[in-house]
Amino acid sequence: MKLVMLLRPPPQTHRADTTDGLPGLQEEPRGGDGPTCSGPAPAIPDSPSRCLSRGFAGRDPGCHRNRHRVHPYILSGGQRILVTSSSSSTVQGPLSSGSSQHSQSRGRPPSPDSTETERARTPVNSDRQRAGEFDLLKGGCRPCCLIEGNGNKVKCLRFRLKKSHRSRFLDITTTFWATGDEGSDRQGNGTILITFTDTTQRDLFLGSVSIPGELSVRRITISTD
């Protein structure tokens, strides 16, 4: 006869002071586990959780922040995600005095330059007149030349005189014509008037500047009555 012995396993209990059914052995924390919190991290957006999981071993009980800040978020259905962001921050310093002065100066007109102020105070003593201050009868007597002819040729001569012989005369007018009885119809030839400081300058001008033969040159002197 064969005897078969059936061994019954010891009863398992679920007491807190037993491990795997062995009485007298208390459950100890697993090796490498760090401090845990009593409850889950609060699900507050944009606020770092102080204790996230049991995987942060070797930290002090205060669970200080690392260089990375972790923000918990809750999705629909109760699921949680962790979003890690860098702790870098940008510090904006105060505005410099130069930029503030620049913003203030845009609201007021610029002050005149010292050279411009001095130039406005200085009277014109030379016989040479400034631009916009042409005076045909300055001094009571002015030697001049009238050059008449075809309008286009007179204009070309005036352009050449201003470009190449500017130091040989005082002032020169634009090309002008006489007008008719009605409207602005031009009559006669185109004319320019050239003024000089004295008769000597006029003689030097006429002796050194070539004038086309089809243009007529008249020496005149303008004076007041």
Curated annotation (Swiss-Prot):
Compositional bias annotation for Low complexity: 92-108
One GO term of the biological process aspect: regulation of DNA replication
Primary localization class, coarse: host cell
Subcellular location: Host nucleus
Functional summary from the UniProt entry: Plays a role in limiting the replication of viral DNA in keratinocytes. Recruits the host NCoR/SMRT complex to viral replication foci to mediate repression of both viral replication and transcription.
Family indicated by similarity: Belongs to the papillomaviridae E8^E2C protein family.
Protein name: Protein E8^E2C
Lineage of origin: Viruses, Monodnaviria, Shotokuvirae, Cossaviricota, Papovaviricetes
